[in-house]
Amino acid sequence: MRLIPLVTAEQVGKWAARHIVNRINAFKPTADRPFVLGLPTGGTPLTAYKALVEMHKAGQVSFKHVVTFNMDEYVGLPKEHPESYHSFMHRNFFDHVDIPAENINLLNGNAPDIDAECRRYEEKIRSYGKIHLFMGGVGNDGHIAFNEPASSLASRTRIKTLTHDTRVANSRFFDGDVDLVPKYALTVGVGTLLDAEEVMILVLGHQKALALQAAVEGNVNHMWTITCLQLHPKAVIVCDEPSTMELKVKTLKYFNELEAENIKGL
């Protein structure tokens, strides 16, 4: 596992965006051989999306031959709702780059048959072989996507009940009213995530410090979903300074020295 310890949220976003752009450009995607990118929502990736849009407008990357799969979507929230993840992605990323509409894949939280929708999503991912890079965030309790504590590490795309803590955390997007936050969501599974060629998780803020500590210094534990990254052959965590407050000094020193060349220029 790689840990990229940075100082600010803006630096985390810029590093993540630069990494994505480098991966896409090195892959040299075509219409017949697209680069497959997994994407998250929420507050954490906003700086990364902003940086990606800026790099696209500067001519440094094209998304014309990129296929995307989003991590999750609320159940029962109309896709036109401003807080649906469909709306979020278009508002913050898709509408500002050259990705074709047919290359965008989002779960349908209003599908008449939820189980069939989850199977369809998994089959669509498999039809491309694999996701080349899956970017994600992490919750205070270590959840990735909506794989809450005690999620199976072999799980696939499915419906999940959101914990009260997750709904409280997300209520900031619903005028602070937890009752407006949906109780259920569709989410890729931990197994789906681990199938990706590379997984990159962004960690911001002191509230995520215990989750980061579990991921880097703890044991694999289904109560901390983020620890699944220890099972992945190519996982990278990009974090800001406040999120590292629970890490041992020697752990942070080790990764700072190891990644010194990769941190330059931010």
From Swiss-Prot:
The record marks S151, R158, K160, T161, Y254 as: Part of the allosteric site. GO terms for cellular component: cytoplasm. One of its GO terms (biological process) is N-acetylglucosamine catabolic process. Its EC number is 3.5.99.6. Keywords: Allosteric enzyme, Carbohydrate metabolism, Hydrolase. Disulfide bonds: none annotated. The keyword Iron does not apply. Pathway: Amino-sugar metabolism; N-acetylneuraminate degradation; D-fructose 6-phosphate from N-acetylneuraminate: step 5/5. Coiled coil: none annotated. The keyword Hydrolase applies. It comes from the Bacteria. GO terms for molecular function: glucosamine-6-phosphate deaminase activity; identical protein binding. The active site is at D72 (proton acceptor), D141 (for ring-opening step), H143 (proton acceptor), E148 (for ring-opening step). Allosterically activated by N-acetylglucosamine 6-phosphate (GlcNAc6P). It holds the Pfam family Glucosamine_iso. Gene3D superfamilies: 3.40.50.1360. InterPro entries: Glc/Gal-6P_isomerase, Glucosamine6P_isomerase, Glucosamine6P_isomerase_CS, NagB/RpiA_transferase-like. It is an enzyme of class 3 (hydrolase). It catalyses: alpha-D-glucosamine 6-phosphate + H2O = beta-D-fructose 6-phosphate + NH4(+). Catalyzes the reversible isomerization-deamination of glucosamine 6-phosphate (GlcN6P) to form fructose 6-phosphate (Fru6P) and ammonium ion. NCBIfam families: nagB, PRK00443.1-5. Homohexamer. Belongs to the glucosamine/galactosamine-6-phosphate isomerase family. NagB subfamily. This is Glucosamine-6-phosphate deaminase.
